Curated annotation (Swiss-Prot):
Species of provenance: Paraburkholderia phymatum (strain DSM 17167 / CIP 108236 / LMG 21445 / STM815)
Name of the gene encoding the protein in the UniProt record: leuA
GO CC field: cytosol
Transmembrane segments: none
Pathways involved: Amino-acid biosynthesis; L-leucine biosynthesis; L-leucine from 3-methyl-2-oxobutanoate: step 1/4
Protein name: 2-isopropylmalate synthase
Chief location bin: cytoplasm
Residue ranges annotated for the Pyruvate carboxyltransferase domain, each copy included: 5-268
Residues noted as binding Mn(2+) in the record, renumbered to the chain: D14, H202, H204, N239
Keywords on record: Amino-acid biosynthesis, Branched-chain amino acid biosynthesis, Cytoplasm, Leucine biosynthesis, Manganese, Metal-binding, Transferase
Length: 516
């Protein structure tokens, strides 16, 4: 029987560290439920000591998720570890993931600790974590740039203290496949008690090699856990992509010889959910989940695929969750048909009132758009959830615009502030600029617009536009997403969504970063 590769997803922790990717508690819960449906082995739900918001999200997820192990990150100190244990209490089974830097650069410049102090701190941290659970993971931060002899000493010591998973972190994406794979291999060979722990890999994509390095850690090094995120989400250039790891190991089982517990048909739904919640659009040529991943433009390729799919396709689109039947509903579709499609898409709404509200939005969209696609339905539910969690301090009501060739466009927008309607009017260099200016005449947020992007959710001129707006204020960066067949209205909704996140803090109260 083949060994099993453990999939450890850190979308909710490391992925969320992408600038603008902060998620509300409700959004984290929706992603956690989707990860559970995908049968992810371990879900790192956050960093409990970083903020009250993260603690609350972890605590709630720990009580809801039953089929995946829930994990919280903690620095190598008693306060962080106690906070993680408290957040994880509702879980049937949980993991504490503690870490400390081990590279000379980090020990000297960041920690200002000697190697012996770091060694002792690592031992104490694992010993304390074992008081709460027998599932303890230890990561040597910046492990790929650490001294080999010292790294071996630290890892041997923490395994002796009870660490059951050892995670070799390529924190800055410095590794290359052969060297990183051999690093993991050497550690497993040199550490006398290495057989007492599962070795794990955690790679960043700064040089574009996160997936390659992770696979080398598995094949060459013998690692049996990969830490990854949906869509490769993460700060800087991102993290190891879950979908690429899973499909590489599944498609090339002849080479890797490993089993997986993942339901791969849930990969694309997870990708779309994370993209629409965070506003980080998946590039069309992204492996596995990109819109063009299974598209064939070459006539020779098309002819081959029509004759036999395996001539040019090494995996089937339906195996990762792409559906051939795109048009699902129209304005004559009833509530039961809508509810059934939600279930087929793996979308779970918590109450009848939420279902009724989503169905109302669906009917409103169907009156304006003849064909409703899966992506439209996901967008409806995602936007509904975001508005509910944002408490709608600001709420879009209506928009009118006037534009003639040679004249500056004028916009008039009606929106509510804590339930009281206000009207903003302004001119701009285009209809979108005029609309956002009109909002600011009443809000005066003082924020800076860092990003404005438009993406068509589906195909055709009737497609809904999905607009992502990224705002910065006082060091905080937030994303807002809005959808509407009218691009200008979608822009207004996205801007208001971002303002709500700035106002609410997006569940982040004095957050602290954690780099592994």
């Amino acid at each position: 029987m083949a060994d099993k590769l453990i999939i450890f997803d850190t979308t909710l922790r490391d992925g969320e560290q992408s600038p603008g990717a902060s998620m509300t508690k409700e959004e984290k819960i929706r992603i956690a439920k989707q990860l559970e449906r995908m049968k992810v082995d371990v879900i790192e739900a956050g960093f409990a000591a970083s903020s009250n918001g993260d603690f609350d999200a972890i605590h709630t997820i720990a009580g809801m998720i039953k089929d995946s192990t829930i994990c919280s990150l903690a620095r190598a100190n008693d306060k962080d570890i106690q906070r993680a244990a408290d957040a994880l209490k509702p879980a049937d089974h949980f993991r504490i993931h503690t870490f400390i830097a081990t590279s000379p650069l980090h020990m000297e410049k960041k920690l200002r600790m000697s190697p012996e102090q770091v060694l002792e701190q690592a031992k104490l941290a694992v010993r304390f974590a074992r008081k709460f659970t027998n599932d303890v993971e230890f990561s040597p931060e910046d492990g790929s740039r650490s001294d080999m002899d010292f790294l071996c000493r630290v890892l041997e010591a923490v395994i002796a203290e009870g660490a059951t998973t050892i995670n070799i972190a390529d924190t800055v994406g410095y590794g290359v496949p052969e060297l990183y794979g051999n690093l993991v291999k050497t550690l497993r060979e040199r550490i006398p008690n290495s057989d007492k722990a599962v070795f794990s890999v955690h790679c960043h994509n700064d040089l574009g090699m996160a997936v390659a390095n992770s696979l080398a850690g598995v094949k060459i090094g013998g690692a049996r856990q990969v830490e990854c995120t949906i869509n490769g989400l993460g700060e800087r250039a991102g993290n190891t992509s879950l979908e690429e790891i899973v499909m590489a190991v599944r498609t090339r089982k002849d080479y890797f010889g490993l089993d997986l517990g993942i339901d791969t048909t849930q990969i694309v739904p997870a990708s779309k959910l994370v993209s629409q919640i965070t506003g980080f659009v998946v590039q069309p040529n992204k492996a596995v989940v990109g819109a063009n991943a299974f598209a064939h433009a070459s006539g020779i390729h098309q002819d081959g695929v029509l004759k036999a799919r395996d001539t040019y396709e090494i995996m089937r689109a339906e195996d990762v969750g792409w559906t051939a039947n795109k048009i699902v509903l129209g304005k004559l579709s009833g509530r039961n048909a809508f509810k059934q499609r939600l279930q087929e898409l793996g979308i779970s709404l918590d109450s009848e009132s939420e279902l009724n509200l989503a169905f109302q939005r669906f009917k409103e969209l169907a009156d304006r758009k003849a064909e409703i696609f899966d992506e439209d339905i996901i967008a409806i539910v995602t936007e509904e959830s975001a508005e509910a969690q944002e408490k709608e301090h600001y709420k879009f009501v209506s928009l009118s615009q006037h534009s003639e060739t040679g004249e500056r466009p004028h916009a008039r927008i009606v929106f509510s502030v804590e339930g009281k309607e206000v009207v903003g009017e302004a001119n701009g260099n285009g209809p979108v600029d005029a609309t956002l200016n009109a909002i600011e005449t009443e809000v005066g947020s003082g924020s800076e617009l860092l990003l404005y992007s438009v993406n068509a959710i589906t195909t055709g001129t009737q497609a809904q536009g999905e607009v992502t707006v990224r705002l910065s204020k006082a060091g905080r960066i937030v994303n807002g997403v809005g959808t509407d067949p009218d691009i200008v209205a979608a822009s207004a909704k996205a801007y208001i969504s971002a303002l709500n996140r700035l106002y609410a803090g997006a569940d982040k109260l004095n957050p602290q970063r954690a780099d592994i």
